[in-house]
Amino acid sequence: MHIGTTLTNYIIETQRNLPEATGEFTGLLNDISVACKRIADLVNKGDLVGMLGSADSENVQGETQKKLDVVTNEVFIEALTQNGHIAGLVSEEMDDIYTLPNPSQRGRYLLLCDPLDGSSNIDVNVSVGTIFSIVRAPQGSENPSAGDFLQHGTEQVAAGYCLYGPSTILVLAVKGQGVQMFTLNRDFGEFILTRKDVQIPEDTQEFAINVSNQRHWEEPVQRYIDECLQGKEGPRGQDFNMRWVASMVAEVHRILCRGGVFMYPLDAKIKAKGQNGRLRLMYEANPMSLIVEQAGGGATTGRQRILELDPSDIHERAPVVLGSRNEVERIARYHQEG
């Protein structure tokens, strides 16, 4: 597939390489791209259409929702439930699964998404994004249950994100087909392939972590960051740079483009809240881990490969360390050493 091809043509070509593929998969990815285009327009207009600021509501995690959190969730529901390509939907912004109303046609797939990741940045005009994961729906199920969504990350058919920044970029990882980047050409409203078969450098001198939590970190994380901060004079023998955007989509996109490691590890503060991590497994950690692994990187909790975690709840949380493979493996080794 050549640079400059449209997302639609790429999907059609990719589907030919998938066993038991039908037009539903193409249709579903087209539905997602339509939703992302609409969200890109809302993000771009911001206060011009009254989209900035907080809504008078909280999501299931107890987090105050931004106006755009609510609106983008509605955009996804409208775009994804009209054409019969999915059987159900899970969103960060909804307590329970979204079941299609009768007599809607049910598709072969289930969608899990964070409609607007990093929304705390929206009021200050910092990049935000959409994250999505696609898994197969159980055969013969009229209305899927929450348990049907609880599949290992390795079972994802595809995953991706859309970054709303200076340009709008859709990154897609179809299982076994690598990672591709598509840039929205606003002149004619199409996502165009601009980078194909993206690979993350194995080594890096950049890390992204919220250092304000340093006093709460576990020893393996403390050791790793301490070594990085010692630079050339320390055991690593090289200087490192720190990055932190507080938007997972922006962090992962930077890593895909030039390498790095992103960390939101388990720490004492998170444990005190009775949580297993900060980021959501099913619609943040799993899809991003599939993307990173298909680009040659690694993704772990520090103790276990993320894609092999056994999920127990659609809003379950997990620690996340992902990015350049050699650094991720080093951090995992530090956890093993204790």
Swiss-Prot record:
Residue pairs linked by disulfide bridges in the UniProt entry: none
Cofactor(s) essential for the protein: Mg(2+)
Enzyme Commission (EC) number: 3.1.3.11
Chain sites annotated for binding Mg(2+) 1: 92, 114, 116
Domain of life assignment: Bacteria
Residues where Mg(2+) 2 binds: 114, 117, 284
Family, similarity comment: Belongs to the FBPase class 1 family.
PANTHER family assigned: FRUCTOSE-1,6-BISPHOSPHATASE-RELATED (PTHR11556), SEDOHEPTULOSE-1,7-BISPHOSPHATASE, CHLOROPLASTIC (PTHR11556:SF35)
The protein, known as: Fructose-1,6-bisphosphatase class 1
Organism for this UniProt entry: Halorhodospira halophila (strain DSM 244 / SL1) (Ectothiorhodospira halophila (strain DSM 244 / SL1))
The gene coding this protein: fbp
